[in-house]
């Protein structure tokens, strides 16, 4: 059994802050845990407006707190995000994420992240990032 505490994880190297200042993510479960997926609690800062395109991963995102929107770039559709909303990037969807308020999100990635990933120039995470 694995048991971790979010407050303790935030005070460790499991807390990753994006270089562009849009988000921070506490990586609670990672590839080395051998569960087949990773689980993160991610804070998207108010005013963040950025493009992502996870070419190497599938992701599901559940909004715990805050409000914003996600836009699929293929068709320009915008979907409101509020507490209780789940969006699923099941087709490696290129998208924009906008935070009208600070948002706290619970994120699941498959394949699992190693831990140190930040978005590359295409808005994706690399598969060969350093493990925590």
Swiss-Prot record:
It comes from Teredinibacter turnerae (strain ATCC 39867 / T7901). This is L-ectoine synthase. Signal peptide: none annotated. Pathway: Amine and polyamine biosynthesis; ectoine biosynthesis; L-ectoine from L-aspartate 4-semialdehyde: step 3/3. GO terms for biological process: ectoine biosynthetic process. InterPro entries: Ectoine_synth, RmlC-like_jellyroll, RmlC_Cupin_sf. CDD domains: cupin_EctC. The keyword Lyase applies. It holds the Pfam family Ectoine_synth. It catalyses: (2S)-4-acetamido-2-aminobutanoate = L-ectoine + H2O. The keyword Repeat does not apply. Keywords: Lyase. Its EC number is 4.2.1.108. Catalyzes the circularization of gamma-N-acetyl-alpha,gamma-diaminobutyric acid (ADABA) to ectoine (1,4,5,6-tetrahydro-2-methyl-4-pyrimidine carboxylic acid), which is an excellent osmoprotectant. Belongs to the ectoine synthase family. It is an enzyme of class 4 (lyase). GO terms for molecular function: ectoine synthase activity.
């Amino acid at each position: 059994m694995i048991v971790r505490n979010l407050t303790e994880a935030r005070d460790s190297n499991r807390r990753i802050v994006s270089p562009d200042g849009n988000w921070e993510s506490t990586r609670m479960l990672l590839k080395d845990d051998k569960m087949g997926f990773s689980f993160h609690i991610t804070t998207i800062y108010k005013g963040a407006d950025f493009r992502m395109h996870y070419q190497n991963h599938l992701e599901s995102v559940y909004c715990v707190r805050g409000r914003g929107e996600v836009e699929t770039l293929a068709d320009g559709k915008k979907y409101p995000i509020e507490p209780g909303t789940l969006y699923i990037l099941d087709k490696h969807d290129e998208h924009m994420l906008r935070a009208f308020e600070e948002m706290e999100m619970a994120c699941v990635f498959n394949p699992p992240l190693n831990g140190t990933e930040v978005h590359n120039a295409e808005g994706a995470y690399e598969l060969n990032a350093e493990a925590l």
